[in-house]
């Protein structure tokens, strides 16, 4: 009897030790990424990110697409070449490019002249993106809308996506469309919220887009983002990680790391794994939310461990 009890206790100990390892095999940790403006790109900064455990970046394009201080093509080429060299030297992958957005460069514009000009600008940016060799190119579906024009805007978005997607494919990248903030339809007397404001609207839009155009989900833009992850499934190819209240552009560090925000990160991670998501855990938080890059790494490790513990 004593031998049987001893064997049972040994077996129990083995199972207890092995379970966390098995759990981590089933749910391998994601790489960690961070959004960064191109003006902040230099080797020293990127090396500090890499040393802190950050493997990937998303580059925002506002730094070289500016109507106030436009750069020449030669200046942009030189800037992006230096950027790519710095990333490669630091061992950082350029995962994604966040394309420019704004009222006058809205690819859903019903004014066909503005839409065509917007597409032309995006085409030019994509040509420059060849230098950076990203895996993902992220687009906003729209700027703010006028009242009662959502169906027309969706049709214009679909038209623009069909024009831009072949260019994205030339780069060997995937095109993704981001969900937008919009807990209420109406913003003010002049405007409605952008396209992609609810789970239902994102589903409606994605059904009309080519199958090789994918979804990006901003966890700060919607209440219960796990429901949108669930709806997108394997069509989800990139994320923006931040916490918030689903009503404002908060861009907090995830709660509990910040003590702010309503997101349930255990549910979010659960749905990411169910969707087969293998891209990076790409932060898009305010720089005031962390003191050093290691805070981003430590926050993810905290969230990941909480998720693993929830599966025991």
Predicted region positions:
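Histidine-acidic metal/acid-base catalytic patches
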Residues: 2, 24-31, 39-55, 116, ...
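N-terminal pre-domain/capping segments
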Residues: 2-5, 22-131, 135, 151, ...
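Catalytic-core regions built around general acid/base machinery
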Residues: 76-89, 160-170, 231, 267-271
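Conserved residues at the C-terminal ends of beta-strands
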Residues: 60, 98-100, 140, 242, ...
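Feature marks short, surface-exposed loop/turn motifs that line or immediately flank catalytic pockets
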Residues: 40, 63-65, 101-105, 143-145, ...
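Short, flexible/disordered intra-domain loops and linkers
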Residues: 65-74, 185-195, 253-255
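Hydrophobic core
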Residues: 13, 17-18
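Active-site acidic/histidine proton-transfer and metal-coordination neighborhood
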Residues: 88-90, 105-214
């Amino acid at each position: 009897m004593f031998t049987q009890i001893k064997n049972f206790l040994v077996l129990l100990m083995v199972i207890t030790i092995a379970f966390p390892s098995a759990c981590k095999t089933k749910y391998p940790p994601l790489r960690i990424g961070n959004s960064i403006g191109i003006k902040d790109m230099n080797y020293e900064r990127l090396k500090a990110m890499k040393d802190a455990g950050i493997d990937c970046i998303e580059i925002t394009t506002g730094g070289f697409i500016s109507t106030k201080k436009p750069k020449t093509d030669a200046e942009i080429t030189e800037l992006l070449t230096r950027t790519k060299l710095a990333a490669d030297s630091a061992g950082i992958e350029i995962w994604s490019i966040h394309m420019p957005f704004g009222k006058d460069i809205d690819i859903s514009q019903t004014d066909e002249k503005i839409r065509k000009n917007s597409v032309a600008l995006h085409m030019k940016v994509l040509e420059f993106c060849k230098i950076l060799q990203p895996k993902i190119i992220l687009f906003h579906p729209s700027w703010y809308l006028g009242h009662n024009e959502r169906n027309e805007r969706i049709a214009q978005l679909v038209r623009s996506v069909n024009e831009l997607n072949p260019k994205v494919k030339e780069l060997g990248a995937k095109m993704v469309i981001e969900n937008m903030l919009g807990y209420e339809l109406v913003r003010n007397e002049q405007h409605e919220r952008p396209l992609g404001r609810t789970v239902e609207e994102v589903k409606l839009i994605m059904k009309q887009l080519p199958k090789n155009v994918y979804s990006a989900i901003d966890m700060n833009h919607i209440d219960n983002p796990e429901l949108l992850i669930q709806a997108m499934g394997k069509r989800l190819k990139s994320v923006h990680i931040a916490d918030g209240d689903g009503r404002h552009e908060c861009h907090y560090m995830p709660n509990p790391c910040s003590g702010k925000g309503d997101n349930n990160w255990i549910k979010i991670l659960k749905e990411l794994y169910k969707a087969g998501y293998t891209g990076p855990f790409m932060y898009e938080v305010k720089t005031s939310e962390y003191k050093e890059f290691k805070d981003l790494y430590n926050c993810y490790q905290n969230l990941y461990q909480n998720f693993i513990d929830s599966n025991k």
